[in-house]
């Protein structure tokens, strides 16, 4: 037979009654707290601190609150104890003291402003977002400093370095007829065509008209009999690989009909600017720039091509390029030999109107300020792009190499009179420029190896000014 153990009736009933009473007391207490919180709202900041503190507010905390309200005293860290004091003589807390309780610590915001800056207490103010203060403090001081300018400050400027030709500012907005009537430098007829199959640009210089006559040597009158124009073509910004037409004698209406090809990819050609410069070559071997035409190739249809008549505008480039020379240097320390190869030259300045140029190169070895040896190439007839490929050797001991200089001078051969000077460079101890110094330095660092480099020719006056070795040769 199974037995069932029954719970005593009285004990179960009493436990339920106690639970109901406890729940009712808890609900009443919570409702009272909510009512007090809703009815006692204020503008003060309430900081609720939970912990096993005495339910009664300690005296030290009451003193601090009263002082904050009055604003007459400031507590320092040494005046206020860090822990609350207990009233129990034996220092032990009763059971009511150890029970968890809550109390509110209230401070007025206005008390924060009443504290002096010397107070060690830290005030934390809320960050206001999107709120603009009516009173703004200036970042810069209200009193500005006076800028001191020396009396000779503006005297250091050179107006010629900053002067602009105002007449050229409105060239882009003028038509060719307006440019022609304003400057009266003439017109140039040319065409362009790009070959996609062979990746080259063809420029055809056809003719020019109404070119101004040159001025006589004394500058007193126009010299109608000595107008000898020619055209130089290049693709900016590259001015080294330029082309040059032949010289047309005694005319202001030259007909050139010459074609020139530039090996250049199509996309690169669209980033270039075609520059055609008309130059006059007189009987005194002076090369005077008449005018120029600049055409950005991105603005034209290169594949379709086209013909243009363009009015010449003034050019800021008064001096023309003298040409370039390709050299190779090699030194053999064991043999004490300095080997020089004259490979080629290009776009040399023309010196003879009737027969063109017959250029040759003279090489002169200068030790210190003393001329030691002179050699020269053969001359090539009727060309401004000569190809020599001639080698020369000079005896230079290694201990004398640092004092050696090589002077390269390009002349135009003339059967009737003395040879015409075209250009010069100096390489060695007294180099005529940075490019020449770099070539010499590379040769010294790489013995037994030929070092090639292009050099732009310079005028005689420029070389004489910067290189003492140029003064020792003719």
Curated annotation (Swiss-Prot):
SMART domains: C2. Residues 96-117 have a biased composition (Low complexity). The modification Phosphoserine is found at residues 118-119. It comes from the Eukaryota. PROSITE patterns: C2. GO terms for cellular component: exocytic vesicle; glutamatergic synapse; plasma membrane; postsynapse; trans-Golgi network. Residues 60-117 are annotated as: Disordered. It is a peripheral membrane protein. Expressed in brain and kidney. One of its GO terms (molecular function) is calcium-dependent phospholipid binding. Gene3D superfamilies: C2 domain. Residues 184-310, 321-455 form the C2 domain. Plays a role in dendrite formation by melanocytes. Belongs to the synaptotagmin family. This is Synaptotagmin-17. The lineage of its organism: Eukaryota, Metazoa, Chordata, Craniata, Vertebrata.
């Amino acid at each position: 037979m199974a037995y069932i153990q029954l719970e005593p009736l009285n004990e179960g009933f009493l436990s339920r009654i106690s639970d109901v009473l406890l729940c009712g007391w808890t609900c009443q207490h919570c409702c009272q707290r909510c009512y007090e919180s809703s009815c006692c709202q204020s503008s003060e900041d309430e900081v609720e601190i939970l912990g096993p503190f005495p339910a009664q507010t300690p005296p030290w905390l009451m003193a601090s609150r009263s002082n904050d309200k009055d604003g007459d005293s400031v507590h320092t860290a040494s005046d206020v104890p860090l822990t609350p004091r207990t009233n129990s003589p034996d220092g032990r807390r009763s059971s009511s003291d150890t029970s968890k309780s809550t109390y509110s610590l209230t401070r007025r915001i206005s008390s924060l402003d009443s504290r002096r800056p010397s107070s060690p207490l830290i005030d934390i103010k809320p960050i206001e977002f999107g709120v603009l203060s009516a009173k703004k403090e200036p970042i810069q001081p209200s009193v500005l400093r006076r800028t001191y300018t020396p009396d000779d400050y503006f005297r250091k400027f050179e107006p010629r370095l900053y002067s602009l030709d105002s007449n050229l500012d409105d060239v882009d907005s003028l038509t060719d007829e307006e440019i022609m009537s304003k400057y009266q430098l003439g017109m140039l007829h040319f065409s362009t065509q790009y070959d996609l199959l062979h990746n080259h640009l063809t420029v055809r210089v056809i003719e020019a008209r109404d070119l101004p006559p040159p001025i006589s040597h004394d500058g007193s009158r126009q010299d109608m009999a000595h107008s000898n124009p020619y055209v130089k073509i290049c693709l900016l910004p590259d001015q080294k690989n330029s082309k040059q037409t032949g010289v047309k004698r005694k005319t202001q209406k030259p007909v050139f009909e010459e074609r020139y090809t530039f090996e250049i990819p199509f996309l690169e050609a669209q980033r270039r600017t075609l520059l055609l410069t008309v130059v006059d070559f007189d009987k005194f071997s002076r090369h005077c720039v008449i005018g120029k035409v600049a055409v950005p190739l991105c603005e034209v249809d290169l594949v379709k091509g086209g013909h243009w008549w363009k009015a010449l505008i003034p050019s800021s480039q008064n001096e023309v390029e003298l040409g370039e020379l390709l050299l190779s240097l090699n030194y053999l320390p064991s043999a004490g030999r300095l080997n020089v190869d004259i490979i080629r030259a290009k776009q040399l300045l023309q010196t003879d109107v009737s027969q063109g140029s017959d250029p040759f190169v003279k090489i002169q070895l200068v030790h210190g300020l003393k001329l030691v040896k002179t050699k020269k190439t053969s001359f090539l007839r009727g060309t401004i792009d000569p190809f020599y490929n001639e080698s020369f050797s000079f005896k230079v001991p290694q201990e004398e190499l640092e004092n050696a200089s090589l002077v390269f001078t390009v002349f135009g051969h003339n059967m009737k009179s003395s040879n015409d000077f075209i250009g010069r460079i100096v390489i060695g101890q007294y180099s005529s420029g940075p490019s020449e110094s770099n070539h010499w330095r590379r040769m010294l660092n790489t013995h037994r190896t030929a070092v090639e480099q292009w050099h732009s020719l310079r005028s005689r006056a420029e070389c004489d000014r910067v290189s003492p070795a140029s003064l020792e040769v003719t």
